[in-house]
Amino acid sequence: MTVPDYQSLMLPLLTFAGTRQGEITTNQAVEVLAQELGLSEEDLREMLPSGTQSTFGNRVGWAATYMKKAGLLEPTRRGYYQITERGQELLAQHPPA
């Protein structure tokens, strides 16, 4: 499997945030989403061209950034965020994957 783009990670990330009581970190999301999506070790080792960050971790981070801008996630403190009421309302509508 290839590493999904950040748009494809938005709903799984929001769903993960919605199942947690309280805040999450990108590292927690990376670990859980990698398992849920069935990514291989090779997929997880893939690095950005700069060689400074994993491609998957980067894309999970961008998915979180854009969902924060949309008001679906909110930062709670540095490196932590949680689902908002708006995010919970969206999940309750059962959006298509």
Predicted regions span which residues?
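Short amphipathic alpha-helical elements of helix-turn-helix/winged-helix folds
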Residues: P12-R20, V32, A63, L90
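Short helix-capping/hinge SLiMs at alpha-helix to coil transitions
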Residues: G18-Q21, Q35-L39, T76-R77
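A short, conserved structural fragment
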Residues: K68-R78
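Minor-groove-contacting beta-hairpin "wing" of winged helix-turn-helix DNA-binding domains
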Residues: G79-T84
